[in-house]
Curated annotation (Swiss-Prot):
Belongs to the FBPase class 1 family. Mg(2+) 1 binds at residues 69, 98. GO terms for cellular component: cytoplasm; cytosol. It comes from Ovis aries. AMP binds at residues 18-22, 28-32, 113-114, 141. This is Fructose-1,6-bisphosphatase 1.
Length: 337
């Protein structure tokens, strides 16, 4: 006989974890309220994603969002869920969503001190073929003394107090980065709670996978072409890198975090400013990767150092294991001469 119980009676839920962190920092508890509310939305989206075919949520809603992407029915549902739960958390004052042209200003009676930027359903072009998709979020403190406005969201990623993503894959995982590091929580559907499964996650110093859409290779700049060539045909005859690209940022970045390597969505001739959005895609992912010991750059500067000028601003991004990103930057510097 073993003394080990078949059921862990001392589980660490995301609520318990954030409350413990808040107690150490002598916080007000507003962050716990906010993340609890966000988890409620993530659970609801996870359920909707898994029921989408039965509930007729596949297909296009007949509109495009502010960045020109076709809006899917699940996008609309997910956006409404996140907006409503964040407003009712009494912890937010400004919300920025990929799906809304302007920032959402929370009603005075529901306002708190946080600004949240989010992509409610990233990778939604993959919904119909059942590829993993996700929700991305970044949380800032309001720093101005004025009434809440769109300007409160135009902060560099260095000001983030928390960021992360939910991945709706073979299981639903929440990856949360805060000042002390990155922690992963798995949704246990039996009890409806996110359970801590990986504490203080660190990315490998060097990986063996590169990830980008090589369909755009004719528009790559010389540095990127040279880097990819080196990964396929290493000059020192070492093993070539594997190529993995899902086309869903959450899935690609999560794999990079877990296995190491490099993820690239660079600028090219067709998209000189890149295609991914700074506030609710690049900054949160860069924050997660940096807190895990990795690097995130545009090729010219650290993603987290950029001061946004527009809530839907686009930037190039290269992130991942520090040695892999450094190698790319060295090639970039060398080819620019």
């Amino acid at each position: 006989m073993t003394d080990e119980a078949p059921f862990d009676t001392n589980i660490v839920t995301v609520t318990r974890f954030v409350m413990e962190e808040g107690r150490k920092a002598r916080g007000t508890g507003e962050m716990t309220q906010l993340l609890n509310s966000l988890c409620t939305a993530v659970k609801a989206i996870s359920t909707a994603v898994r029921k989408a075919g039965i509930a007729h949520l596949y297909g296009i809603a007949g509109t495009t969002n502010v960045t020109g992407d076709q809006v899917k029915k699940l996008d609309v549902l997910s956006n409404d869920l996140v907006v409503n739960v964040l407003k009712s958390s009494f912890a937010t004052c400004v919300l920025v969503s990929e799906e809304d042209k302007h920032a959402i200003i929370v009603e005075p009676e529901k306002r708190g001190k946080y600004v949240v930027c989010f992509d409610p359903l990233d990778g939604s072009s993959n919904i119909d073929c059942l590829v993993s998709i996700g929700t991305i979020f970044g949380i800032y403190k309001k720093i101005s003394k004025d009434d809440p406005s769109e300007k409160d969201a135009l902060q560099p990623g260095r000001n983030l107090v928390a960021a992360g993503y939910a991945l709706y894959g073979s299981a639903t995982m929440l990856v949360l980065a805060m000042v002390n590091g990155v922690n992963c929580f798995m949704l246990d559907p039996a009890i409806g709670e996110f359970i801590l499964v990986d504490r203080d996650v660190k990315i490998k110093k060097k990986g063996s996978i590169y990830s980008l859409n090589e369909g755009y290779a004719k528009d790559f700049d010389p540095a990127l072409t040279e880097y990819v060539q080196r990964k396929k045909f290493p000059p020192d005859n070492s093993a070539p890198y594997g190529s993995r690209y899902v086309g869903s940022m959450v899935a690609d970045v999560h794999r990079t975090l877990v296995y190491g390597g490099i993820f690239m969505y660079p600028a090219d001739k067709k998209s000189p400013s890149g295609k991914l959005r700074l506030l609710y895609e690049c900054d949160p992912m860069a924050y997660v990767i940096e807190k895990a010991g990795g690097m995130a750059t545009t090729g010219k500067e650290a993603v987290l150092d950029i001061v946004p000028t527009d809530i839907h601003q686009k930037v190039p991004i290269i992130l991942g294991s520090p040695e892999d990103v450094t190698e790319f930057l060295e090639i970039k510097k060398y080819t620019a001469k």
